[in-house]
């Protein structure tokens, strides 16, 4: 998988990809990350890539010419072009899976300032938002995309690790504990120390349903629950 990130602030991207799972994925050649400085595609003085908006108003707007030149410099027939923007569809695990399973090259355009020339959308395949709030620029959103997609690719993390994470199978992850066994009178559940793997598995499945019902009931899809989880779900719903 190759990511091409078009940005005004390459250092933000560089600082992140030098750490943790992303760095290991690059070292394993599971992913490639290409950082493209948008200013390099400007033909104006001081590498200007923004200007005042027609019709007046506050805030600067990213100009179409450098954006399209940057996109076309890396785009191939196998590319998908994403734009980080508040008006995009909200990123979720289902969208992440679609990108990780179906594309070899993802171009991410980082939005900035007041926005971008609307004509840019003719060259964009998907607009993506990371939530209903405003951040300074699209770099953080682009890194969230890279991180979430990369961890689902082969040889990045163990398959078992991400299959048991929150949002897989439309459930939150079960509670986890480590040492010490007791802290301020709160103990680790005894079942986790029992050594009985079947009971531990059963407890974890129960806790996934309980936690999801309490904290994110909107996620649950009963068609994806196993028999034991469905029993817990029905019991919990009956108690509410």
From Swiss-Prot:
Named from the GO MF annotations, one term is: tRNA (guanine(37)-N1)-methyltransferase activity
Residues binding S-adenosyl-L-methionine are: 111, 130-135
Q: Name one GO biological process term.
A: tRNA N1-guanine methylation
Major localization class: cytoplasm
What is catalysed by this protein? Answer: guanosine(37) in tRNA + S-adenosyl-L-methionine = N(1)-methylguanosine(37) in tRNA + S-adenosyl-L-homocysteine + H(+)
Gene3D superfamilies in UniProt: 3.40.1280.10, tRNA(m1g37)methyltransferase, domain 2
Q: What does this protein do?
A: Specifically methylates guanosine-37 in various tRNAs.
Q: What is this protein identified as?
A: tRNA (guanine-N(1)-)-methyltransferase
Species of the source: Mycoplasma capricolum subsp. capricolum (strain California kid / ATCC 27343 / NCTC 10154)
């Amino acid at each position: 998988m190759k990511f091409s990130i078009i940005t005004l602030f390459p250092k933000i991207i560089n600082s992140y990809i030098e750490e943790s799972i992303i760095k290991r994925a690059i070292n394993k050649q599971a992913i490639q990350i290409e950082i493209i400085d948008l200013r390099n595609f400007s033909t104006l003085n001081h590498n200007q890539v923004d200007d005042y908006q027609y019709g007046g108003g506050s805030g600067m707007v990213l100009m179409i010419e450098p954006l399209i030149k940057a996109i076309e410099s890396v785009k191939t027939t196998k590319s998908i072009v994403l734009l980080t923007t508040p008006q995009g569809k909200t990123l979720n695990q289902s969208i992440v899976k679609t990108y990780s399973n179906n594309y070899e090259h993802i171009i991410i355009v980082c939005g900035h300032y007041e926005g971008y020339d609307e004509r840019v959308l003719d060259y964009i395949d998907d607009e993506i938002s990371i939530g209903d709030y405003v951040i300074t620029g699209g770099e953080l959103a682009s890194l969230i995309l890279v991180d979430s997609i990369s961890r689902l690719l082969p040889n990045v993390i163990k398959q078992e690790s991400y299959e048991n994470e929150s949002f897989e199978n439309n459930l939150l992850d079960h509670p986890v504990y480590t040492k010490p066994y007791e802290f301020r009178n709160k103990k680790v559940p005894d079942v986790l120390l029992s050594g009985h793997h079947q009971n531990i598995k059963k407890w974890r499945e129960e806790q996934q349903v309980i936690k999801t019902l309490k904290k994110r009931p909107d996620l649950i899809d009963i068609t994806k629950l196993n028999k034991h989880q469905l029993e817990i779900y029905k019991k919990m719903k009956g108690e509410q």
